[in-house]
Each structure stands twice: as structure tokens, then as C-alpha cells.
Amino acid sequence: MEEKKFHNFKNKKFSSIAWIMAVLVIVIAVILNMIVSQLDLGWDVSPNKQYSLGKTTTAYLDELDQNGTKIDFYVLAKMDDIKDSVDTLALYRALKEYDEHDCINLIDIDPNSDEATMEKINPDNALTLNTGDMVLVCGDTKKRIPGNTMYTTNSDDNGNAVSQTFNGENILTGAIKSVVDGFTPTVYFLTGHGEKSADDNYTQFKKNLQNYNYAAKSLLLSDVDAVPSDAAMILVAAPTSDISDSDKDKLDAYLNEGGNLSLLMSPNAGKFNYTNLDLIMEEFSIIMDYDTVKETDASMHVSGDDSTIQCNLVELSSDSEAADLTSSLINQGLVPYMTNSRSFYFDTDTTGTLTTAELLTTNDTAVGEPNGGAYDTKKITNSELMLAGYSQSNTKNNAKLAVFGNADFLDDTHLQDSRYLVAVYLYLSTISWMYDTDVDMGIDSKSTVYDEISLPDANSARSLMIVFAALPVAIIIIGVGVWVKRRNS
């Protein structure tokens, strides 16, 4: 009898201790959770440290802290909204870690209600800003970062997301370095040869360039010894006369160092050749026709205007560095138009050290009618004519040349016409391909893989849900039964 009492006393003692320990664990967990919530602490236990900044970023930010550098980092969304979405958690954690450094002044705003701040960061409305975008400002240098560049989502054949890659750290740290260095790449509009004016004809396009983080300026080569060092590209828009020998020498020197040139060569009825520009194009195996392209199929041109024609985007090889120039536009099923254009072709006998590709071509019902030039030429028929193309020279430090047969589609008048938007986007893509404004810090992207269970039908799904619901209940019942049995034993 005494032994049984002792046994019951021992069971009660152990049960009491167990209950006390359980209560203590719950109390401690609640207190710790409250502390962590108040301090907004977090531990990154992901395999690839997806929610932590890497050594490259932290070392660079530490250096800026020591130098006393200050960057205003505007986020066009409230941090609480970013935090609440699982899809943007990596971005939220990155922004929080950036903000821990003295050099970063993180300012999150609601772009729809904070008009004063929006006016401050975009006073002339040059930037097209959307919710989720970011703007970095350091001194007089400003850079826009589209929010949709932070992630890349990969889907399966059924459109289901299978993985998500966070690209944000490399982009954001590179953008910080860009504004700290105070370097803004510039698109220079060549002048002095009757070209269309950046200030008079391309005011909206200049704003588009700013939106892509380029500056836009005019350049008269006769006033300088060489092309400026901040040149991302030289743009020549519809010159009415050839460039001089001296101008050609300066452009040659620029291209030999890996420069970028874009020629928008609208048809010109003048009875002369663009001798020096032709020579530059020939070095890239591009031959310019002295013609005006017209469409003979009435269903392929604007009613009453056979020189405003429907044309075709050319799909580039998937392993080409320039594949993205046309792929996204083609995938959207967009139909391009071009107006009053001349044509070009490649000299295939001289393309050995070059990478060349057509970007925009006509249908084979179009013709090239002779127009201008020092010599009589024949009409070009029964051929798909090239209206835009590019060439990259391996012997000139990867210098790039892009040609378009018209300069009007970018001007203030035509930019309002939706028919030319595809050509405009294509042209902007060539600029980004020639000179990417993003500074690559060499920081790897971080991936998240979504696990999923494939079930054959709804009945299987219901059965699985019942199992998931019943299993914990069964475990609890068994546990209680064991406890009761031990208590009464």
C-alpha cells in the first residue's frame, strides 16, 4: 500500500513538473516572439542566404560609411506592403539591411498620395515612375530602378511558377555605385550636317532616354578634339549632308576604342553620296541603298500612303548576345510599321570578323525605288529589304553600329502614333544593347524553388486533406491514452 502511494506521489510530481515546464516554454516563447516582433529581428537560415546582403555589398557600403557618403534611396511603396508579401520578402530584407548603413537614407513613400516627394524627385516629369520603382539620388546624379527588374520568375509549360530569382542586390548595389561615382552615360546627337535637332525634334525621346538613365546632349565634332569620354553612343539623325573627313577621323578613333554609333538615315533626294558615312558603314559590312522603300501590296501599307508600311521583326539566334532586341516584341505578337524608309544590305563577303543581323525587314512585295545618290540605280524588287540592322566588330573592341532607314519615327510628331511604338521600343533596345547603364557588381542572383504536389483529381486532394487533418488528432488521442494509462498504472 505504501509503495502504491509512493508511486502515485511520484507520478503526480513528474506530471506537475511536466506541466510547469510546458507553461514555462510557452511563456518564454511568447516573450521572445514579442521582443523579436518589436525589434524586427530575423535570422537568415536559407541555403543561399537569400535574405542577407553578400560580402561585396557590405564591404562597399562599409567603405561609403567611412567616407561619409550619403545616398537618398526612395522606394515608391510602403515598406509594410513589401514586407507583407511572401513574393517580395527578399527585397524587403535587402532594403532593411541597406538602411542599416549610415550612407543610405531609405525613404519609403506612397506615390499616389505623397505629391510633394514625387515632385522633389521628378520635378520635370522626365521619369516614368510606377509603384514599386526606386530612385537613388547622390549629389546631382539620379538613377531610376524599375521595380519589375528585382525578380525573374520561371514557369513551367502550364504557366505555373516553379522558381523565382532575386536579382535585386546586384542591381541595387550597382545603382548605388553609379550615383556615387556621379557618372551618367550620354547619348550624343551629332550636329553640323543638317541633322534633326535633339531640342527641336526629339524632346519626348530625350525624356525617354532619361527614363533609361541616359543623359542626352548635342555634339558638334568640329568644336572638340575627340568624342567625349562619357559617350554611350553617337546618334546621327537624318543628316542632309555628309560628314567631313575630320569628323570621320574622330568617329573612327571613337569606334576603334569600342564606341557605339547609330545612324538614322532617312531618304534624301540630293544627288550626292554620303561618302564618309558610307565608308564607316562598309567597315561594318553594311551597304546603304539610295532609295525609298514602298509597298506594292495595298493590305501591307497605310491607306493612301505606300511608303508607310507594315514590316517584320527578325527573330535572332537564341545564343546571340542581342537576342533580346527582338524576342520580347515578337513574343507579344506586335506588328511594326515604318515610314518613309531607305534600305540596307550586308556585304556577306566581308563579315568574317563581324557579328551581324537584320532587325527589321519588309515583306517581299515591297520595292526600293531609286532616290538620291550620285549615280543612277535600279529599282529593287522581289526581295525582303532590310530597314534596320546591326553589326558588331571583333577587331574594334566590340564596337557596335546600328542602322535604321528613317529618323522620323522617333520625333515628337510620330512618337504619338501607336503604329510606330514597336520601332521605338526596338530602337531603345538597341541603345541598351550597345551600352547598358546598369553597373554589374558581379553579385549572383538568389533563387527560390517552389515545391508542389501533383494530384490526379479532386478526390485525391480531399483524401490527402483528411489524412493531414486526421493524423494530428490521432497522435493527440494516442498521446492522451498513453498518459492516462501511465497515470493510473
Where are these regions (language model features)?
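Short, surface-exposed patches at the edges or C-terminal ends of soluble domains, predominantly
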Residues: E2-S489
